[in-house]
Design a protein with these regions (language model features):
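Solvent-exposed edge beta-strands and adjacent loop segments
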Residues: 1-70, 117-132
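Viral virion structural and adsorption modules
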Residues: 1-4, 139, 143-159
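Generic alpha-helical propensity signal that fires on short helical segments
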Residues: 47-50, 82-84, 133-139, 156-158
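Extracellular/virion structural assembly segments
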Residues: 49-115, 145-154
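Short beta-strand and beta-hairpin "edge-sheet" elements
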Residues: 32, 98-146
Length: 159
C-alpha cells in the first residue's frame, strides 16, 4: 500500500488560445478541493416507508486558493479574469487533473481527466505583511477520461 499525497495529483491548465494552446502546471495553488455536488431527486411510493434517492447529475466544483506570484502563467490568467471582470466564455479554461500515482506504459504518461470549467475568482485578499492570495472556484463541466504526458503536456482521450 502507498499513501497518496496531495502532490501526487497534478493540475494543469490551458492558459493559451484555441489557436495556440499553452498548458501550464498550476504551480502556486495552495489549496484545492474536488466537490461533486450531486444533483438528486427523491421519490416515495405509497407502498414504501422510506423514499428513494437517485443521483441525476453533478455540478463539479473545485474551490481554489492561489498565492499571487508575478510570472506564474496560471495565476496571471485567473487574476486577469478577476481583475477585468470577464464574463461568459472568457471565463472558460481547460483543466487537466493528472494522477501521478497511476503511470501508463509510455514514459511520463499518467491516467488523467480533462474538464472545461468556468473560473470564478471571488476574492483577492491578504493581511498586513503577508503574501496576497486569490480565492474562488472552478465550476461545472463534464470529464473526459484519458492520459496525460507531463513532458509534452499532451492529453489523449480514451477511445
Amino acid at each position: 500500500m502507498q499513501d497518496i499525497m496531495v502532490y501526487d495529483e497534478a493540475h494543469y491548465f490551458d492558459v493559451g488560445t484555441s489557436e495556440t494552446p499553452d498548458i501550464e502546471l498550476g504551480g502556486v495553488i495552495t489549496e484545492m478541493t474536488e466537490s461533486t455536488n450531486p444533483k438528486e431527486t427523491e421519490k416515495q411510493y405509497i407502498h414504501q416507508k422510506s423514499s428513494i434517492t437517485k443521483t441525476t447529475g453533478y455540478a463539479n466544483e473545485f474551490p481554489i486558493t492561489m498565492d499571487m506570484v508575478k510570472g506564474d502563467k496560471v495565476f496571471e490568467n485567473f487574476y486577469k479574469k478577476f481583475y477585468e471582470r470577464k464574463t461568459g466564455n472568457d471565463l472558460n479554461i481547460d483543466h487537466y487533473i493528472v494522477n501521478l500515482w497511476e503511470s501508463e506504459t509510455e514514459a511520463n504518461t499518467y491516467k488523467a481527466r480533462k474538464i472545461t470549467q468556468t473560473v470564478s475568482i471571488t476574492e483577492c485578499n491578504g493581511a498586513a505583511g503577508e503574501q496576497k492570495q486569490i480565492t474562488g472556484s472552478l465550476k461545472g463541466g463534464d470529464f473526459v477520461y484519458g492520459t496525460f504526458n507531463t513532458s509534452t503536456k499532451t492529453f489523449t482521450p480514451n477511445v
